[in-house]
């Protein structure tokens, strides 16, 4: 049986703003925990979020640079899930009205041009940071420390359509997107500092099938090398499973950099699991003027 892989990439880029997405707390780069906090970014009752105009401008700039259609009106939604580093128990994001839709990004591999289709570009606030004792995995940790300096930092999320067919294409796409964010001066794009993070959604299906296979999400890829190796491993794992008659389960898997394998983290959530609904607190906005792109 001839099989083909299909890959989609979700990328989060930390924006170069002085303050957080919905409050006036400074964006800080420090190892000292919990020094840039306020009632808004740690979700205390009664605190009202006010959107960061500069962050929305940066996201719009990236959306324009990738040829997206800019929505005339934007609004914010609550993405509901429960995790210790999410103090409100929901994340302010965007759902059916993102900043941009239906763009593309040109990549070059071995002097050959290709275009990766982008489904959407939208805003999302960052979570806090969890540090687990021991191996760094929550399953084996005896304690977990929480740092909320990062909570509420503005991110732009870029979601591709499932059009990538190899790890080489995926790496080329991330390299190009990273360079674009640096050229636009909207992010430092430093992987080692977590300015740019990415997850891969991978499925394998028969070559002649018009439908995609069961999607598996891969997390914890902290470098381009990790991205390439994790995708290659997961394609091989799913291919062997299908050839052996084993059903692929929709789930989220963790890339182990040392063992160079993926392992099950949890069942994969869908949009219904997050129970998106419009957030009544931050005001919606309208794109009255658009930023100008020069020299890119």
Per-region residue spans from a language model:
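Basic, nucleic-acid-interacting segments
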Residues: 1-288
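Single conserved hydrophobic/aromatic residue that forms the stacking wall/gate
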Residues: 287-296
């Amino acid at each position: 049986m001839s099989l083909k892989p299909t890959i989609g990439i979700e990328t989060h880029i930390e924006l170069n703003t002085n303050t957080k997405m919905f409050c006036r707390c400074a964006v800080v780069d420090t190892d000292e925990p919990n020094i840039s906090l306020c009632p808004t970014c740690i979700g205390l009752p009664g605190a009202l979020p006010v959107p960061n105009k500069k962050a929305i401008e940066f996201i719009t700039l990236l959306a324009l640079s990738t040829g997206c259609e800019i929505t005339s009106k934007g609004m914010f939604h609550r993405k509901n899930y429960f995790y210790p580093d999410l103090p409100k128990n929901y994340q302010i994001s965007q759902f059916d009205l993102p900043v941009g839709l239906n763009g593309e990004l040109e990549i070059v591999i071995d002097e050959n041009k290709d275009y990766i289709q982008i489904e959407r570009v939208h805003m999302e606030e960052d979570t806090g940071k969890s540090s687990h004792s021991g191996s760094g995995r929550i399953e084996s940790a005896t304690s977990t420390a929480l740092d909320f300096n990062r909570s509420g930092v503005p991110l732009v999320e870029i979601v591709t359509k499932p059009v990538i067919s190899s790890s080489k294409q995926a790496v080329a796409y991330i390299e190009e997107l990273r360079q674009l964010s640096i050229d636009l001066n909207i992010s430092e794009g430093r992987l080692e500092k977590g300015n740019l993070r990415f997850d891969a959604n991978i499925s394998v299906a028969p070559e002649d099938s018009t439908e995609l296979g069961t999607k598996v999400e891969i997390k914890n890829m902290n470098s381009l090398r990790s991205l390439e190796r994790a995708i290659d491993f997961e394609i091989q794992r799913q291919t062997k499973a299908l050839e052996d008659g084993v059903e692929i389960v929709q789930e989220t898997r963790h890339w182990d950099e040392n063992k160079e394998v993926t392992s099950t983290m949890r069942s994969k959530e869908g949009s219904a699991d997050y129970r998106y609904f419009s957030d009544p607190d931050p005001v919606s906005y309208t794109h009255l003027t658009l930023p100008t792109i020069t020299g890119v």
